[in-house]
Regions:
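A short beta-strand-turn-helix
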Residues: 4-22, 62
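Short pre-active-site segment immediately N-terminal to redox-active cysteine/selenocysteine motifs
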Residues: 19-20, 27-30, 72
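Non-catalytic, surface beta->alpha helical segment in thiol-disulfide oxidoreductase systems
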Residues: 72, 78-111
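Conserved redox-active cysteine motifs that mediate thiol-disulfide chemistry
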Residues: 26-40
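Conserved Rossmann-like nucleotide-binding pocket used by diverse enzymes
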Residues: 3, 27, 52-54
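CheY-like receiver
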Residues: 109-124
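Conserved helix-turn-beta segment immediately C-terminal to the redox Cys motif
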Residues: 19-21, 36-56, 62
């Protein structure tokens, strides 16, 4: 049984703003690469208890896709502790997707949060 949550605009905001790692796959039923990538995403969701996996159907949620600047599908977004760490378009091969998941988990979030705070302070 897959551990993937379907998100809409309201649930997206709460899902990505909390603690922990959330990987979001923006997809569409008519998208060939999305269908190719789906088993890779599902396998990762079943094997990685340290990460929350979610999907957004862009046809059911066009406003969310627009707000998230999704211009092609599939688009992957990786959030950790409420901060967007990665966004890319295109289906990833299994090994590359696993590398992305490991890299997101290995990020020093104290350093990232310090950089975000410094940037916000400099912008007034």
């Amino acid at each position: 049984m897959s551990k993937i949550t379907d998100l809409d605009l309201e649930s997206f905001r709460s899902a990505v703003s909390g603690e922990g790692t959330v990987i979001v796959d923006f997809w569409a039923s008519w998208c060939g690469p999305c269908r190719q990538f789906a088993p890779v995403f599902e396998e990762a969701a079943d094997s990685r208890d340290d990460i929350t996996f979610a999907k957004v159907d862009i046809d059911d949620n066009p406003e969310l896709a627009s707000l998230a600047n999704v211009s092609s599908v599939p688009t992957l977004m990786a959030f950790r502790d409420g901060i967007l760490l990665h966004q890319s378009a295109g289906a990833l091969p299994k090994a590359q997707f696993q590398q992305l998941l490991d890299a997101v988990q290995d990020v020093d979030m104290d350093e990232v949060k310090a950089q975000v705070a410094a940037r916000e302070a400099s912008q007034g």
